[in-house]
Amino acid sequence: MAALAALRLLHPILAVRSGVGAALQVRGVHSSMAADSPSSTQPAVSQARAVVPKPAALPSSRGEYVVAKLDDLINWARRSSLWPMTFGLACCAVEMMHMAAPRYDMDRFGVVFRASPRQSDVMIVAGTLTNKMAPALRKVYDQMPEPRYVVSMGSCANGGGYYHYSYSVVRGCDRIVPVDIYVPGCPPTAEALLYGILQLQKKIKREKRLRIWYRR
């Protein structure tokens, strides 16, 4: 009887201890989960406090902002008044003349052909470049003022074209002068050359000459 009475007295005590143990175990599990995966408020705070790197394209000072706007103004004026130097070497020159005709009217884009390299800022190499003509091409290119651009028109100017394996043909005018725009075709149409001129205007728009000079 005494043993039964003792068991009856121990039963509520054991129940309380088991409940406390279960509560402690659940609390430990929650604390470990919180340690493994932080709460949703912590990333927001850390992201808010994190320092976001500033892109290099954005101006970081007033002086750089003024230089950037001046750069945009100069690029706008430069791309709106391209003066190409005619360097017709083969049948591609006929399509280049076609682009200057009233049907396509390249003057509406500010493109005006000049006869002197000292008044030009664009050279359109139209046709097959031979080994004898290569020194003349380089000499004319060196006489053009900076900044200067080169448009390679046609397969022969791009890589030799039909005469790629000829002993007397340069396999691409980019071996003589740096080329900015390649216009494919044999010969390319006037629309293709006009599209190449528009791509050159987009390239000039993205230039950052003054900003690069200012950041030195």
Swiss-Prot record:
Domain of life: Eukaryota
Reactions listed under catalytic activity: a ubiquinone + NADH + 5 H(+)(in) = a ubiquinol + NAD(+) + 4 H(+)(out)
Residue sites binding [4Fe-4S] cluster per the record: C91, C92, C156, C186
tRNA processing in keyword set: no
Post-translational modification: Hydroxylated ar Arg-114 by NDUFAF5 early in the pathway of assembly of complex I, before the formation of the juncture between peripheral and membrane arms.
Cofactor notes: Binds 1 [4Fe-4S] cluster.
Biological processes annotated in GO: aerobic respiration; electron transport coupled proton transport; mitochondrial electron transport, NADH to ubiquinone; mitochondrial respiratory chain complex I assembly
Residue positions where Hydroxyarginine is found in the record: R114
Pfam families to which the protein is assigned, alphabetical: Oxidored_q6
Keywords assigned: 4Fe-4S, Electron transport, Hydroxylation, Iron, Iron-sulfur, Membrane, Metal-binding, Mitochondrion, Mitochondrion inner membrane, NAD, Oxidoreductase, Respiratory chain, Transit peptide, Translocase, Transport, Ubiquinone
Localization terms from the record: Mitochondrion inner membrane
Gene Ontology cellular component terms for the protein in this record: mitochondrial inner membrane; respiratory chain complex I
Membrane topology qualifier: Peripheral membrane protein
Transit peptide: 1-37
Enzyme class: translocase
EC number(s) per entry: 7.1.1.2
Cofactor(s) the record lists: [4Fe-4S] cluster
Entry GO MF terms: 4 iron, 4 sulfur cluster binding; metal ion binding; NADH dehydrogenase (ubiquinone) activity; quinone binding
UniProt xrefs under NCBIfam families: nuoB_fam (TIGR01957), PRK06411.1 (NF005012)
Function text: Core subunit of the mitochondrial membrane respiratory chain NADH dehydrogenase (Complex I) which catalyzes electron transfer from NADH through the respiratory chain, using ubiquinone as an electron acceptor. Essential for the catalytic activity of complex I.
Family stated for the protein in its record: Belongs to the complex I 20 kDa subunit family.
Subunit and partners: Core subunit of respiratory chain NADH dehydrogenase (Complex I) which is composed of 45 different subunits. This is a component of the iron-sulfur (IP) fragment of the enzyme.
Protein name as catalogued: NADH dehydrogenase [ubiquinone] iron-sulfur protein 7, mitochondrial
